[in-house]
UniProtKB/Swiss-Prot annotation:
InterPro entries: Fmt, Formyl_trans_C, Formyl_transf_N, Formyl_transf_N_sf, Formyl_transferase-like_C_sf, GART_AS, Met-tRNA-FMT_C, Met-tRNA-FMT_N. Attaches a formyl group to the free amino group of methionyl-tRNA(fMet). The formyl group appears to play a dual role in the initiator identity of N-formylmethionyl-tRNA by promoting its recognition by IF2 and preventing the misappropriation of this tRNA by the elongation apparatus. HAMAP family: Formyl_trans. The keyword Amino-acid biosynthesis does not apply. Keywords: Protein biosynthesis, Transferase. It comes from Ruminiclostridium cellulolyticum (strain ATCC 35319 / DSM 5812 / JCM 6584 / H10) (Clostridium cellulolyticum). This is Methionyl-tRNA formyltransferase. It is an enzyme of class 2 (transferase). GO terms for cellular component: cytosol.
Length: 312
């Protein structure tokens, strides 16, 4: 069985690694073009490309994947199966029709919930307690194809998007492995998705990280977790942008004498801030002029006053 693997970020690497370790014939990898990264804006290769080259696998990086020329290039390679994992672009019907076994996708949610580009982030931001991996046959819609296998994963109360991402990437490879075993044995069962139960997880932008202190304590805590490590939750103090990397919910009642966003106390434990229904403790922060640090380390050389208001 000849396989073409399509993926781009770190999430996809364990799935590709599994294919290699299990002896599958990966004849090519399709990944997105190198992109400028960091302050120097030097071109950086996608993690999937780096991994593929380390293992001597042919790498294709088309700027556009829907052109007749690229579809023909895939057809000439003669794959039996396409496998996608966080590739980042919708695949055309012409390409989906090339492999006789179709295209299997590894998706980071329990479909039909959280279709789209950022299911891991949004599952935390929205306060989900459980998420998981779904393998599916890809169709021309956005994560709308028939489901194959599902496996759940618990989201702990303080888990960040980065931590969940790493666990989901490993789980994705495991579920893909089982899916391919069923495919070879002819025991795959396809389950259509119920569109009435679907939800959408749009791409995460930097603006998503802006903290609204009029939200509940739990909502603010979830936003901080769900945007860590990217794009990062943030607020403003005296018009300076302050990133908030870690918070904890504290039992401090819900006094009406403080307004949302007000700093109630500052000490080695952290910065206590009022939300609409209670108080949250900022434990780690970062300003543009400094590195990420614990509050106790920051206040040794910098002053943050109680009574100040966070936000614009």
């Amino acid at each position: 069985m000849k396989i073409i693997f399509m993926g781009t970020p770190e999430f996809a690497v364990p799935s590709l690694e599994m294919l290699i370790n299990e002896g599958y014939n990966v004849i090519a990898v399709v990944t997105q073009p190198d992109k400028p990264k960091g302050r120097g804006k030097k071109l950086a290769a996608p993690p999937v490309k780096e991994f593929a080259l380390e293992h001597g696998i042919k790498v294709l990086q088309p700027a556009k994947i829907k052109t007749p020329e690229f579809v023909e290039q895939i057809r000439e390679l003669g794959p039996d199966l396409l496998i996608t994992a966080a590739y980042g672009k919708i695949i055309s019907k012409d390409m989906l029709d090339v492999p006789p076994l179709g295209c299997i996708n590894v998706h980071g949610s329990l479909l039909p919930a959280y279709r789209g580009a950022a299911p891991i982030h949004w599952s935390i931001i929205n306060g989900e307690k459980v998420t998981g991996i779904t393998t599916m046959f890809t169709d021309v819609g956005l994560d709308t194809g028939d489901m194959l296998l599902k496996r759940e994963l618990e989201i702990s109360s303080d888990m960040t998007a980065g931590e969940l991402h790493d666990e989901m990437a490993i789980l994705g490879a495991e579920v893909l492995k089982d899916t391919l075993i069923h495919l070879k044995n002819g025991t795959l069962v396809r389950s259509p998705q119920d569109d009435a139960l679907s939800s959408y997880a749009p791409i995460i932008t930097k603006e998503v990280g802006l903290i609204d202190w009029n939200k509940t304590v739990q909502q603010v805590h979830n936003l901080v977790r769900g945007t860590n490590p990217w794009p990062g939750a943030f607020t403003f103090i005296n018009e300076s942008k302050m990133r908030v990397w870690k918070t904890c919910i504290v039992d401090f009642g819900n006094s009406q004498e403080h307004c949302p966003g007000e700093i109630v106390s500052v000490d080695d434990k952290g910065i206590l801030v009022k939300c609409c229904d209670g108080y949250i403790m900022i434990k780690e922060l970062q300003f543009d002029s400094s590195k990420r640090m614990k509050v106790r380390d920051y206040i040794r050389g910098n002053k943050i006053d109680t009574g100040e208001k966070l936000g614009k």
